Amino acid sequence: MSSPEPTNPVAVVTGSGRTRIGNLIARDLANAGYRIAIHYRQSHEAAEKTVADICSAGGIASAYPADLSEEQEVDRLFEHVATNFQRLDVLVNAASVWSPKSLEKVTAADVYDNFRVNTLATFLCCRRAGLMMSLQETGGSIINIGDARMDRPLADYSAYLTSKGSIPTLTRSMAVELASRNPRVRVNAILPGSVMAPPEATEVEQQRRRDATLVKSADLPHTVCHTVRYLIDNEFVNGTCVMLDGGRALLGP
């Protein structure tokens, strides 16, 4: 791990408490020397363990709880970041919810819950962080995590995929809005495939996942981390949604 200095860049990663893709992104950025703000909603113990792991490896990290669908809590989160770190260079919106449910059983409450976390929270964080970044000479980079399946939906995920389908439009809109305030603020998105296989997946299922891609490889979490770094580092990429599915979309259903 690169030893961070008090002037090193700062990254906020939402939904990074538990061992999901946000957590892996936060750890990867910490390894690159970023000072990390771990966001969680309920996973307090997991978030504190992540902070402890990063700090024991020589990094700098803090954990912050927030319900990101509540505007006041979003404001409070970024006020804490501004107070504790004095800057914000990267925001990765990785917080999300999903739960398979047949169309017959999906309720209005289910749809609302998906939009509340997957759409509204992403919007509120983009706006708050983006306006904060626009006041910095260095600008900043916002990366939204969408889903490659939004154009090739799976059954039983209608509420989830509908909410995730807003991410490309949200990303492009925020890119235009924020660039008009500071051209060094960029907003991009990653649309990954199933990067974290369920623990119970059999080898046959894993092989099926590999065979369903052009590259004949599983969607691995490190590919998302690499893409996050690319979008941070490449200052000429803005308003782009990177499809990260190994070419699966070209092979049909």
Language-model regions, residue ranges each:
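Canonical Rossmann dinucleotide-binding motif of NAD(H)/NADP(H)-dependent dehydrogenases/reductases
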Residues: 3-37
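Conserved Rossmann-fold SDR core element
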Residues: 87, 178-195, 237-244
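Conserved NAD(P)H cofactor-binding loop of Rossmann-fold oxidoreductase domains
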Residues: 94-100, 247
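A short, exposed helix-loop element centered on a Lys and neighboring polar residues
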Residues: 126-127, 172
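C-terminal substrate-recognition "lid" of short-chain dehydrogenase/reductases
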Residues: 181, 220-244, 249
